[in-house]
Design a protein with these regions (language model features):
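A short beta-loop-alpha structural element at the N-terminal edge
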Residues: 12-26
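Conserved acetyl-CoA-binding loop of GNAT-fold acetyltransferases
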Residues: 143-153
Length: 178
């Protein structure tokens, strides 16, 4: 387990636990509702067993500010169906960043990237990566402003192994090189 603390705003990054399960899904639902208002690709209902596995394997994370979950996300060291041949690279992959609406606009992606850089080094990884679906221009620009390099669009070949929102077969890929 890797925990980060930002003393300026008392932000803590730590692993989610099963006690956070309902809150994680509440934040996923809030993210989907927000996506609906922006006319972008909307997240589906995610598999509860997937999230339980991520929690059990210490791959589900949260930002906590004053005892409130402000943001959640998941990590993995492999993402073959999205990154295909680049999956062989030593990388941390970030998935499903969902922000508590009360904390929207706090630039958690910057904090997550800062944390992920340290986490990657501790785990002998050389890249921090994430992806998004659809043509959400503002989100693409936001990830770039946060420090990620936009690598372009990948035309996915094995979408049957991915959640429903990947059905278009196109993923926007982002990377930070350590």
């Amino acid at each position: 387990m890797f925990v980060g603390v930002n003393k300026e705003n008392k932000m803590q990054i730590r692993n989610s636990t099963l006690a956070d399960f309902d809150e994680i899904f509440r934040l996923y639902a809030a993210a989907s509702a927000y996506q609906t208002t922006k006319n972008v690709t909307i997240w589906p209902q995610f598999d509860e067993n997937l999230v339980k596995t991520e929690i059990h394997e210490h791959r589900q994370w949260k930002v906590v500010i004053e005892n409130t979950t402000a943001c959640v996300w998941a990590t993995t060291f492999e993402d073959p169906f999205i990154w295909e041949e680049k999956n062989a690279d030593p990388a941390v992959y970030i998935h499903r960043i969902a922000t508590n609406p009360v904390f929207r606009g706090q630039n958690f992606v910057v904090a997550i990237l800062d944390w992920a850089k340290e986490y990657a080094v501790q785990n002998d990884k050389k890249f921090v990566r994430l992806d998004t679906i659809g043509d959400n221009t503002k989100l693409i620009e936001h990830y770039q402003k946060c420090g990620f390099t936009f690598l372009g669009t990948s035309h996915l070949t094995n979408i049957s192994q991915l959640p429903a929102h990947y059905s278009s077969g196109n993923a926007k890929l982002f990377e930070y090189i350590l």
